[in-house]
């Protein structure tokens, strides 16, 4: 992919991000999600039928066939467009939702729009746009948020929080004072759902408390233990990780979910960050998530084809179904306690 330069710094960086994410060094090396330590029941007499297990879920007012979103990954270059269309096709076929990668490049370079245009292949999926919190401290406002949603015909917008990534990025945006007020201000001007998400270092309790009185529809905890975007940035900049201790910072996914459910008991939560199997998903749902989001494990299949991405997701969903079945559940709602 590095042999396909775009001539634009942002787009070139997006391609390098993809390359870096495929490297094992992009993953947390010491910190784990904590999901392995979440107890899961095993029932030798489950008293249910596997094939009748109900997984359908309503999220942001849309019905999904399973509580699964394709997480935010990429956009802004030709290769990214292929990935996004393959993922959207898989989401369409399976009745899932999808988050786009950061659309800043699309707003600043309109010809990058095509790489985010997935409605041609998936006209009816739940589609979530994406902009960075830092951009709202640098002149972005409700107008740019509306463009990010309207120009790709999305249903909602995720605003991603990535201070550690920005701090370790060459030329990163690190002026964040006043950002909490600014995000609430912008969200109040919008007439579509706004989601707050981390990028893989976790939403902490203090941040959730600070956002609690804002008009946010959901929170993606994006916990530590999967892809470290701090590591990704250092791999892009230096070819290796120069600050390994800093790159291990974050709130592990299981801890982030527990804190979020305690801090915002009525909020809709997305669990992401190191979700690698259907059992991970089941455990995350048991901690209070409404849906889970998966990104990194889908990157290689999506580079191959929509069929490969769909096959990975089918297996993931079947793992979730089996976990619920042997756990004694008959419906995904039961695992959440509702």
Swiss-Prot record:
Entry keyword annotation includes Hydrolase? no
Q: What is its main location?
A: cytoplasm
Q: Which GO terms describe its molecular function?
A: FMN binding; isopentenyl-diphosphate delta-isomerase activity; magnesium ion binding; NADPH binding; oxidoreductase activity
Q: Can you name the source organism?
A: Deinococcus radiodurans (strain ATCC 13939 / DSM 20539 / JCM 16871 / CCUG 27074 / LMG 4051 / NBRC 15346 / NCIMB 9279 / VKM B-1422 / R1)
Q: Which SUPFAM superfamilies did the record assign?
A: FMN-linked oxidoreductases
EC number(s) of the enzyme? 5.3.3.2
Q: Name one GO biological process term.
A: isoprenoid biosynthetic process
The protein's UniProt keywords, in alphabetical order, are: Cytoplasm, Flavoprotein, FMN, Isomerase, Isoprene biosynthesis, Magnesium, Metal-binding, NADP
Q: Which cofactors are named for this entry?
A: FMN; NADPH; Mg(2+)
User: Which positions are annotated as binding FMN?
Assistant: 72-74, 102, 130, 197, 227, 274-276, 295-296
Q: Where, per UniProt, does this protein localize?
A: Cytoplasm
Q: What InterPro entries is this protein classified in?
A: Aldolase_TIM, FMN-dep_DH, IPdP_isomerase
Q: Could you identify this protein by its name? A: Isopentenyl-diphosphate delta-isomerase
Q: Which domain of life is it from?
A: Bacteria
Q: What is known about its subunit structure?
A: Homooctamer. Dimer of tetramers.
Listed transmembrane segments: none
